[in-house]
From Swiss-Prot:
It comes from Thermoanaerobacter sp. (strain X514). The keyword Zinc-finger does not apply. This is Phosphoribosylformylglycinamidine synthase subunit PurL. It holds the Pfam family AIRS_C. SUPFAM superfamilies: PurM C-terminal domain-like, PurM N-terminal domain-like. HAMAP family: PurL_2 (MF_00420). Substrate binds at residues 86-89, 108, 232, 304-306, 528. Belongs to the FGAMS family. The active site is at residues 41, 87. GO terms for cellular component: cytoplasm. Mg(2+) 2 binds at residues 109, 260.
Length: 733
């Protein structure tokens, strides 16, 4: 066993700590159990000391971080359950299964809480699709998500996708799931009741995914290709049966505690449940239903075979459980019992093959506060002299270039592969500011979004992360939803590098600041580190998943222009910032400058104003101004509503900056002519600048600045550029 712990990702110091916990040298199975439970993926050992700065309390919070998912009270004895998780490393190696099992895993996190999943979202990051490998990754990640979600019958209603060079070879696949549960039916993973039986339910256990959690805690390299067995294989039809069987089981009083088997499989589910409950657990591996012959204790304990759950059952109710699972054609086997000594004791063929304290696996992983320093290149990339950027001679071309850029263009090629209408509750479909899903039997709806501009976070992780939170909240407000909770997925490079740790720390502080100011608690989340390729780390990408509550679904608002002659109004102020903008990258090939600065109090006022205007029925459309600036937002609203616009701007800014600056917080709204004065009056009361800039009319976009016509383009030409870009990229050789 020469230094085998190193191969499994443990340091020599960590190995010494294990010896002192056990009072002896661990055997191979025990080393394996510690290696997965103490991996970054399971233990958050580089991020936990920072995560405590996030605000996790709020009047709606029923369950914050620490369980399988977060839970928020939405009234009427109902709660929304939400969680986002990454499946980045598996998707880089085996994109179809990596993405599919990412979806499967996050769905299990939701129904293990007792909730019925109602929606999926996906936040995706890819390299530029100009080579075969990148296209292969994109095609297969999207197909993996689509097939799993479509087969299990849960609508994929939204998400976000960005393409940047930094994600080449290390795509980000962050899957978010949301469910609804009656408040008194929430289930938790807290084992209790000495002598209560422990059952494994669902699929059989095979060799797939062994050591996947430790694999997800390393940088990708050439050798990663050899780790394909670390990627699990998903079966959405099996998961559909498991979902229905579990929800039916929850209607009985047989379940004491339940946990899905995700990363680290039987090891994590057993030690986490036992540790939360302050108890021990004895497991007999001869009773685990296996799908392969000759599996060792190490393999059974570390298998990440999908579609399995571990259940602690009330003593004497085992048959009730078996009856339910038999009906759905699934396994339910009693494999152990709860003990009072706090140990995870694993038995095979009558012999003890592993015996370790549950708490030491689940809670005692070392935590690291790393050294940090500002990256050497940071000062250089933050320099931007606007005078070096010559305004384009042809503004029509500049507009077409910006709206057909990969990050602004329509993502229809992606979301058209998803069934977003299954379950028939989707009220706002993908492609809008936020998705909206009705809650059956009520007037309520939940609005959902994921947001993060990694480029902003690369230029300034503190400000960029605040913008991610602010934009997610603004997107929800645009459809008439009040933001109620965040689930975040922090995607970064190797935290052992000082500049990466600096990015991670500043990003978390930025999220904390924005969530505190906007009063939105973080209820769940995930950290994915070591996201690097040969060139270095990905852009820091703290993806913000957010849910908002709509009390009356009949009052939702969308971004499409509704009526000719409606007046177009910009809310908020253009501060003339173009650092980190899509315009700067697309038209000049530059990723430079400071990201736009954000005043969170200003943001709060704008969001409250938009919610008020929607609630009062005073506006016909609303759309947030972000990537691509005012010009892109205008084109998107026009294309969505199949109506043009005539715009006249008065400004002291340069024409291109007026059109393409991404200064937050801003929104584009349309108002019936007779309601304009009232809207302007209310905006004044909320201290939000509001400027009439034009009207909805015709079939083209015509813009003049300070009396000079600078843009005049038919809507169909713009639509072709905007709608066709990604499809064209994916189909060209």
């Amino acid at each position: 066993m020469d230094k085998i712990w190193r191969e499994l990702g443990l340091t020599d110091e960590e190995y010494e700590k294990i010896i002192s916990i056990l009072g002896r040298e661990p055997n191979i199975t025990e080393i394996g159990m510690y290696s997965v439970m103490w991996s970054e993926h399971c233990a958050y050992k580089n991020s936990k000391p920072l995560l405590k700065y996030l605000p996790t309390k709020g009047e709606r919070v029923i369950q914050g971080p620490g369980e399988n998912a977060g839970v928020l009270d939405i009234g009427d004895n109902l709660a929304v359950v939400m969680k986002i998780e990454s499946h980045n490393h598996p998707s880089a190696i085996e994109p179809y299964q990596g993405a599919a099992t990412g979806v499967g895993g996050i769905i299990r996190d939701i129904f293990t809480m007792g909730a019925r999943p109602i929606a999926l979202l996906d936040s995706l990051r890819f390299g530029i699709p100009d080579d075969k490998r990148t296209k292969y990754l994109i095609e297969n990640v999207v197909a993996g998500i689509a097939d799993y979600g479509n087969c299990i019958g849960i609508p994929t209603v939204g998400g976000d996708t960005y393409f940047e060079e930094s994600y080449k070879g290390n795509p980000l696949v962050n899957a978010m799931c949301v469910g609804i549960v009656e408040k008194d039916k929430i289930k938790k993973g807290i084992a209790k009741g000495i002598g209560n039986p422990v059952m494994i339910v669902g699929a059989t256990t095979g060799r797939d995914g062994i050591g996947g959690a430790s694999f997800a805690s390393q940088e990708l390299s050439e050798e990663s290709e050899e780790k394909r067995p670390s990627v699990q294989v998903g079966d959405p039809f099996m998961e559909k049966l498991l979902l229905e069987a579990c929800l039916e089981l929850f209607e009985t009083d047989a379940v004491v505690a339940i946990q899905d088997m995700g990363a680290a499989g039987l090891t994590s589910s057993s030690c986490e449940m036992a540790s939360r409950g302050g108890v021990g657990m004895e497991i007999d591996l001869d009773k685990v239903p296996l799908r392969e012959k000759g599996m060792t204790p190490y393999e059974i304990m570390l298998s990440e075979s999908q579609e399995r759950m571990l259940v602690v059952v009330e003593k004497g109710k085992e048959e009730d459980v078996q009856k339910v699972f038999k009906k759905w054609g699934l396994n339910a086997a009693t494999i152990g019992k709860i003990t009072d000594d706090g140990m995870i004791r694993v038995i095979k063929e009558g012999k003890i093959v592993a015996e370790v304290p549950a708490k030491s696996l689940a809670e005692d992983a070392p935590q690291y506060i790393r050294e940090e320093e500002v990256p050497k290149w940071q000062e250089d990339v933050n320099k931007l002299n606007i005078n070096e950027v010559k305004p384009p001679e042809d503004m029509n071309k500049a507009l077409k270039d910006v709206i057909s850029s990969l990050n602004v263009a329509s993502k229809e090629w992606i979301y058209s592969q998803y069934d977003y209408m299954v379950r028939t509750d989707t009220a706002i479909t993908p492609g809008m500011d936020a998705a909206v899903v009705r809650i059956k039997g009520t007037k309520k709806a939940i609005a959902l979004t994921t947001d993060c501009n990694g480029r902003y976070c690369y230029l300034d992780p503190y400000i960029g992360s605040q913008i991610a939170v602010a934009e997610a909240a603004r997107n929800l407000c645009m459809v008439g939803a009040k933001p109620i909770g965040v689930t975040d997925c922090l995607n970064f490079g190797n935290p052992e590098k000082k500049e990466i740790y600096w990015q991670l720390k500043n990003s978390i502080f930025g999220i904390a600041k924005a969530c505190e100011t906007l009063q939105i608690p973080v209820v769940s989340g995930n950290v994915s580190l070591y996201n690097e390729n040969e060139e270095g780390a990905i852009y820091p990408t703290p993806v913000i998943g957010m849910a908002g509550l709509i009390e009356d679904v009949s009052k939702i608002c969308t971004m499409d222009f509704k009526k000719e002659r409606d007046v177009i109004i910009i809310l908020g102020e253009n501060k003339g910032e173009i650092g980190g903008s899509e315009y700067l990258k697309v038209c000049f090939g530059m990723v430079k400058g400071q990201p736009p600065q954000i005043d969170l109090e200003e943001e709060k006022r704008l969001q409250e104003l938009v919610l008020k205007l929607i609630e009062e029925g005073l506006i016909n459309s609303s759309h947030d101004i972000s990537e691509g600036g005012f010009a892109a937002a205008l084109v998107e609203s026009a294309i969505s509503g199949k109506k043009g616009a005539k715009i006249s701007l008065q400004t002291s800014l340069r024409e291109d900056v007026e059109l393409f600056s991404e200064s937050p917080p801003r929104a584009l709204i349309t108002v019936s002519p007779e309601k304009v004065e009232e809207v302007l009056k209310i905006a004044y009361e909320y201290q939000v600048p509001a400027q009439k800039v034009g009207v909805v009319e015709g079939k083209k976009i015509a813009i003049e600045v300070n009396g000079k016509k600078i843009i005049d383009l038919p809507l169909e030409v713009l639509e072709e550029s905007w709608r066709g870009r990604i499809k064209w990229e994916m189909e060209r050789n």
